Regions:
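Acidic/histidine-rich catalytic neighborhood of metal-dependent amide-processing enzymes
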Residues: 16-86, 90
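Acidic/His- and Gly-rich active-site-bordering loop/insert found
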Residues: 1-13, 30-35
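Short, conserved micro-motifs enriched in small and acidic residues
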Residues: 6-20, 48, 109-112
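Metal-dependent amide/peptide-bond hydrolase catalytic core
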Residues: 92-212
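Conserved Rossmann-like nucleotide-binding pocket used by diverse enzymes
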Residues: 9, 72, 147
């Protein structure tokens, strides 16, 4: 919270609290007009940490209200009206290897090396999506993006790492098939990464979980 004179400026006043205030201020005017089609306000929470509130909200709307014909989202978007937004998916991929001493790599399965192959493939997928971009698209950038945000693994420099965790995500164009992109990654892991790990031990492998 920042105070300047008689005004207090908390985080999120433009994105999204300003739009909430604007909509509620217009509610009396909407009521006076006796609209034939109702307008519903849907307020959620915790968008930045995985859209935690919206899941229950969508379930409640589906069960208790007619499906909406249109949705107005109060994102600031630099104060410009836009006709759509990219979707978002986030994932956690955990590679389980077989630990051992670095002097005997043939006796273990290196989780970080396997994770590195997955990271490189994510970059390959991103390249394909970028090369297929429509230059006339209103989106910036005009293609589905893949973000590799966090990687963690290993215990010591002389130990074959047993675990490697990769956190990655996608911002998907409305015209793209998110399931197909996700499936491409899962297929690569199943066909190109896991067999090498399981050749050392059946307990090694890769698990990818969608986190939102």
């Amino acid at each position: 919270l920042r105070a300047k004179g008689l005004k207090n400026r908390p985080i999120g006043t433009a994105d999204m609290k300003g739009f909430i205030a604007l909509g509620l201020a217009l509610a009396p005017e909407m009521k006076r007009r006796n609209l034939k089609t109702p307008i519903h306000f849907a307020l959620s929470y915790d968008e930045e940490v995985g859209c935690l509130g919206v899941r229950g909200l969508i379930k409640d709307v589906v069960e208790n209200l007619p499906l909406p014909r249109a949705v107005i989202v109060g994102e600031p978007t630099s104060m410009q009206i836009i006709g759509g937004n990219k979707g978002s998916r986030n994932y956690r991929t955990v590679v389980t290897g077989i630990p051992g001493h670095s002097s005997e790599p043939h006796r273990g399965a290196n989780a970080i090396m396997a994770g590195g192959r997955i990271c490189a493939f994510l970059e390959d997928v991103q390249t394909d999506l970028r090369e297929a971009a429509d230059p006339k698209s209103d989106f910036d950038p005009p293609y589905t993006t893949i973000d590799l945000g966090l990687i963690d693994g290993g215990t010591a420099g002389n130990i074959i790492p047993e675990f490697c965790t990769i956190r990655w995500g996608m911002r998907i164009l409305p015209s793209d098939d998110a399931d197909a992109i996700e499936g491409r990654v899962r297929t690569f892991i199943a066909e190109e990464v896991e067999p090498r790990l399981k050749a050392v031990s059946s307990s090694a492998g890769v698990e990818t979980t969608r986190t939102n």
